[in-house]
């Protein structure tokens, strides 16, 4: 009977894959076809993601998951006892086991953790069930790597599920008070990212709350085939450098159905990222949804195939932004921002190629090339006089900028060194300089 059930499961999964292939072929695309000067379908990329995810799903579905609880390894969950070693021991057991494994952090408890690195590769198909609260130590001496609190490193086919009750709490107030951005008399020092995923393939993060990170809340670095959904990320508007979801050097990632309010970018997308899908995001407070900053310290930067489709931004310092330093090189290309509502947003649409967050930035000849960017079905109100700003490089002007059915009230448009085409009704219209 069990064998028959497994065969039925495989058949149903095969049918699901066939359906997803058909659906993928109808998806509006985000890859630019230069021969036809239009965007073409990313269905082949989508199909590769489906195959990779299906393989892991089938393997896990054919086994009954084993549960490994941190409580079985001595975790107290009283919010006072250091539970770091219990988590490390539970991880080693779960990672080294065969088949599907659930690593359980029980609901209703608070687990105090120092910095912790959970490394792969793992034998198991692993789901980390964070149903309780993870609470960060506030002692600087408890961090072996001052830039990271919880890190998953080199773990393929990993799922992290908060079950709608799980919380990752960075207890960032102590770190913010010592930030040079809050107190100019303080030296600028590093602070931990709350949750880091590094060098991992086929990653799922869902149903999780992350709050008050010491610095960045969730960082996804050097990963591929990633799905992030139904996460709630919060920090005060004045908390320094608390980016919500930070994506760098990552390919084939989708972030969807999430609520983000922070003291920095709600979502930031940096160099090396390709085929990024952002859907159904609520953002505010924060600095908006940003690509960059790119080209820092005269570096090469490449970002391509980014689609932000469905977002509501309220009271943010920026709306949708591309930011690059002078002196860099490379490209930011094939980007779509569409179906976006802005409510009282400063700088709703902005490309800034003179970005500088340092004490001194010099004028340079080289720049990251920004090209093939579409803004479609964007409406709302500007909280500043600048509703649309294209401040592009004199030496490498922005190319292929399209405004299609854009209606932002309360501000003007200024377009410098930008090749802009209007489609449909556009308000305000560019005053090119």
UniProtKB/Swiss-Prot annotation:
Enzyme class, UniProt record, top EC level: hydrolase
Compartment(s) of residence: Secreted, Cell wall
Role of this protein: Polygalacturonase involved in cell separation in the final stages of pod shatter, in anther dehiscence and in floral organ abscission.
GO cellular component terms, A-Z: extracellular region
SUPFAM superfamilies according to UniProt: Pectin lyase-like
The protein's Enzyme Commission number: 3.2.1.15
Disruption phenotype: No visible phenotype under normal growth conditions. Small delay in floral organ shedding.
GO terms for biological process, alphabetical: anther dehiscence; carbohydrate metabolic process; cell wall modification involved in abscission; floral organ abscission; fruit dehiscence
Descriptive protein name: Polygalacturonase ADPG2
SMART domains in UniProt: PbH1
Alphabetical list of Pfam families matching this protein: Glyco_hydro_28
Tissue specificity field: Expressed in roots and in the abscission zone of the sepals, petals and stamens of flowers, at the base of cauline leaves and in the basal cell of trichomes from senescing leaves. Found at the site of lateral root emergence, in the dehiscence zone of anthers and maturing siliques. Also expressed early in anther development, at the time of microspore separation. Expressed in germinating seeds, at the point at which the radicle broke through the seed coat. Not expressed at the junction between the seed and the funiculus or in the dehiscence zone of anthers or pods.
Keyword Secreted: yes
Signal peptide per UniProt: 1-24
InterPro entries in the record: Glyco_hydro_28 (IPR000743), PbH1 (IPR006626), Pectin_lyas_fold (IPR012334), Pectin_lyase_fold/virulence (IPR011050)
Signals that turn on the gene: Up-regulated by ethylene.
Residue ranges of PbH1 repeats: 223-249, 250-271, 273-293, 303-324, 332-353
Family: Belongs to the glycosyl hydrolase 28 family.
One function term, GO molecular function aspect: polygalacturonase activity
Catalytic residues identified in the record: 264, 287
Catalytically driven reaction(s): (1,4-alpha-D-galacturonosyl)n+m + H2O = (1,4-alpha-D-galacturonosyl)n + (1,4-alpha-D-galacturonosyl)m
Protein's organism: Arabidopsis thaliana
Keywords from the UniProt entry: Cell wall, Cell wall biogenesis/degradation, Glycosidase, Hydrolase, Repeat, Secreted, Signal
């Amino acid at each position: 009977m069990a064998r028959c059930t497994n065969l039925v499961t495989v058949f149903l999964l095969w049918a699901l894959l066939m359906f997803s292939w058909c659906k993928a072929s109808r998806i509006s695309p985000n890859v630019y076809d230069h021969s036809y000067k239009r965007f073409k379908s990313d269905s082949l990329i989508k199909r590769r993601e489906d195959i990779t995810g299906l393989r892991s799903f089938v393997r896990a579905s054919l086994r009954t998951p084993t549960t490994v609880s941190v409580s079985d390894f001595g975790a107290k969950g009283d919010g006072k006892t250091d539970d770091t070693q219990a988590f490390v021991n539970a991880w080693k057991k779960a990672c080294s086991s065969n088949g599907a494994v659930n690593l359980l952090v029980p609901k209703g408890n608070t687990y105090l953790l120092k910095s912790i690195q959970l490394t792969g590769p793992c034998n198991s198909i692993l789901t980390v069930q964070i149903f309780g609260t993870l609470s960060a130590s506030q002692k600087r001496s408890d961090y072996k790597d001052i830039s990271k609190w919880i890190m998953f490193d080199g773990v393929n086919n990993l799922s992290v599920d908060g079950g709608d009750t799980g919380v990752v709490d960075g207890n960032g107030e102590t770190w913010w008070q010592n930030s040079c951005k809050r107190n100019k008399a303080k030296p600028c020092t590093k602070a931990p990212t709350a949750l880091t995923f590094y060098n991992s393939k086929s990653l799922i993060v869902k149903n999780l709350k992350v709050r008050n990170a010491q610095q960045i809340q969730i960082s996804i670095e050097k990963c591929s085939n990633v799905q992030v959904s139904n996460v709630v990320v919060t920090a005060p508007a004045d908390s320094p450098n608390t980016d919500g979801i930070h994506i760098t050097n990552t390919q084939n990632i989708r972030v969807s159905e999430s609520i983000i309010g922070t003291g920095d970018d709600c979502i930031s997308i940096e160099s090396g990222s390709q085929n990024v899908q952002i859907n159904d995001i609520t953002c505010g407070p924060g600095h908006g949804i940003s690509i960059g900053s790119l080209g820092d310290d005269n570096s090469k930067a490449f970002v391509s195939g980014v689609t932000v489709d469905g977002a509501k931004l309220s009271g943010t310092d920026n709306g949708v932004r591309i930011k690059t330093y002078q002196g860099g090189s490379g490209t930011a290309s094939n980007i779509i921002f569409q179906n976006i509502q802005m409510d009282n947003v400063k700088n709703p649409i902005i490309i800034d190629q003179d970005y500088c967050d340092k004490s001194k930035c010099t004028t340079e000849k080289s720049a990251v090339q920004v090209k093939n960017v579409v803004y479609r079905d964007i409406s709302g109100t500007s909280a500043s006089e600048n509703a649309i700003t294209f401040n592009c490089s004199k030496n490498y002007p922005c190319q292929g900028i399209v405004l299609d059915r854009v209606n932002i009230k309360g501000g003007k448009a200024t377009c410098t060194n930008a090749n802009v085409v209007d489609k449909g009704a556009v308000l305000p219209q560019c005053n090119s300089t």
